Amino acid sequence: PSPGVFTVDAWARGHIKQELLKVGWPAEDHAGYTPGTPHEIELAEDGWTLRPYQRKAVDIFSEGGSGVVVLPCGAGKTLVGAAAMAETKTTTLILVTNTVSARQWRDELLKRTSLTPEEIGEYSGQAKEVKPVTIATYQILTAKRKGEYAHLALLDALDWGLIVYDEVHLLPAPVFK
């Protein structure tokens, strides 16, 4: 490596960036992300288009490969997520607060993208479908069985190219550090 450039193991990236930030040294991470399993997804802009601020959010995400979208209720965060899915064209895990949200995401994806019902799975207390686009609840992922996060381990083992955290401020921090 060049002077002033450090190489770290992939598993340590997040921890190192957190520690550097704590001491006032934000890290510039150029490692990027793994692309995940390819899966064709297109926006079905039939009679609608993304609003300029939604398009801007998707463009910024595409340039950096990650991001947090903060918009008021009703401003179309789900559409931004769908557009990010269409940009990445990869398998996607969407984490939501409850089954009502899961079904709202499913309905919007079916209405606003080229995805079919066969491509979208629900992974919750009521259903255990793992598909190229899987919508799971935080609750099922944090459920322990014999001291283990069995559902989290199952979904973590898959090659997701994109993970969408809906209502990220409600995310159970001890599990998703």
Predicted regions and their residues:
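Interdomain "pre-motor" coupling segment immediately N-terminal to P-loop NTPase/helicase cores
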Residues: 1-37
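Walker A/P-loop
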Residues: 63-88
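Hydrophobic positions in the central parallel beta-sheet of the AAA+
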Residues: 69, 94, 134-136, 163
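Conserved helix-turn-beta segment of the N-terminal RecA-like "Helicase ATP-binding" lobe
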Residues: 99-126
